[in-house]
């Protein structure tokens, strides 16, 4: 039935996903999104999907004690963007509550990404069944490190860096300074090539002190595809790490990010400028991180034998 313009704009809308014309009374909305209308079919597909669209962002559920929360995005590839496979991983990760979800990622060939809700480091280490999730992904034929398409992205809550935006910005500028100052070591830690980082996690460029770094960033240098993505309102995102299905590597990566945050929050600008890599290493006590640093020949020249990355 043809509609006049007045009726169309006042009483009708279109499904955000498929474009179907809907009367306003028939439009459906997701619980965490009051802006985008859907037809009933598309709403159900999104609500009960094993693999959500790339834009899917549920209301965050926080696990463990804050304010320093870590959100993980782990990309896996090579065995299909298969809802059944995603469902098997969700069944493991979501025992006792929704802790992970899966999303489409256009940068992958035959896979998807596993995303966690925000969790404390302790929760990631002792409550999240990471070892079981990674083992199941391997059993189903997925790769991450070896796929050459995958990243391991770590979000940290902005609230962890200070009580207000100004305090947060100062501490985050020290994160960027640390990353730039120790770029060569972190490049080795990341297991990425410089070419990969130039594409997906580019440098900001080294400055002589953290405050210069902050001014540099304020001028608009940087985008989502930077080593530390600052474009999100509630988090900063480390994008430099290559994907992995190796449990120790994943845990060590979270521990390294945590250590960098410690340095940025608790050291002054002058202390951070004076901090050498060897001095930074000397304070590390976490066994998973120490083992990984030795595997990458970054820890006091003490290499160890290691299992292959997958």
Task: Provide a role label for each language-model segment.
Residues 1, 26-36:
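Short linker/helix segments within small regulatory modules
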Residues 4, 15-18, 39-42:
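Short cysteine-rich clusters marking metal-coordination/redox-active sites
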Residues 14-16, 25-29, 49-50:
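Short Cys/His-rich "knuckle" micro-motifs
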Residues 40-141:
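Terminal catalytic/cofactor-binding subdomain
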Residues 71, 169-244:
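Aromatic/basic-lined ligand-recognition segments
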Residues 111-113, 145-162, 235-239:
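Histidine-centered divalent-metal-coordination microenvironment in nucleic-acid enzymes
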Residues 123-134, 160-191, 246-261, 298-306, ...:
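Helical (often loop-to-helix) elements that flank the catalytic cores of nucleotide-handling enzymes
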Residues 145, 184-198, 262-292, 298:
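Flexible helix-coil linker/hinge segments at domain or subdomain boundaries
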């Amino acid at each position: 039935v043809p509609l006049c313009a007045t009726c169309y704009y006042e009483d009708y809308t279109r499904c955000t996903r498929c474009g179907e014309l809907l009367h306003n009374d028939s439009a459906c909305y997701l619980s965490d999104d009051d802006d985008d209308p859907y037809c009933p079919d598309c709403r159900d597909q999104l609500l009960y999907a094993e693999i959500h669209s790339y834009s899917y962002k549920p209301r965050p559920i926080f696990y463990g004690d804050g304010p320093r929360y870590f959100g993980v995005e782990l990309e896996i590839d090579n065995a299909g963007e298969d809802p059944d496979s995603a469902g098997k991983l969700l069944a493991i990760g979501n025992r006792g509550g929704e802790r992970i979800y899966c999303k489409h990622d256009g940068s992958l060939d035959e896979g998807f990404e596993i995303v966690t809700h925000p969790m404390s480091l302790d929760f990631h280490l002792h409550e999240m069944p990471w070892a079981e999730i990674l083992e199941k992904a391997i059993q189903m034929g997925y790769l991450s490190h070896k796929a050459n398409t995958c990243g391991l992205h770590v979000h940290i809550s902005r609230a962890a860096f200070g009580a207000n935006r100004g305090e947060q910005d100062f501490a985050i500028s020290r994160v960027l300074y640390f990353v730039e100052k120790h770029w060569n070591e972190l490049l080795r830690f990341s297991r990425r090539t410089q070419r990969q980082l130039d594409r997906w996690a580019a440098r900001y460029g080294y400055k002589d002190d953290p405050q210069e770094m902050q001014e540099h960033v304020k001028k608009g240098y940087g985008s989502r595809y930077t080593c530390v993505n600052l474009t999100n309102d509630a988090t900063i995102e480390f994008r430099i790490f290559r994907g992995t299905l190796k449990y120790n590597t994943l845990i060590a990566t979270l521990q390294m990010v945590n250590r960098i945050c410690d340095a940025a929050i608790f050291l002054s600008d002058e202390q951070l400028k004076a901090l050498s890599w060897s001095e930074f290493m000397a304070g590390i006590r976490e066994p998973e991180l120490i083992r990984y640093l030795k595997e990458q020949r970054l820890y006091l020249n003490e290499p160890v034998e290691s299992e292959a990355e997958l």
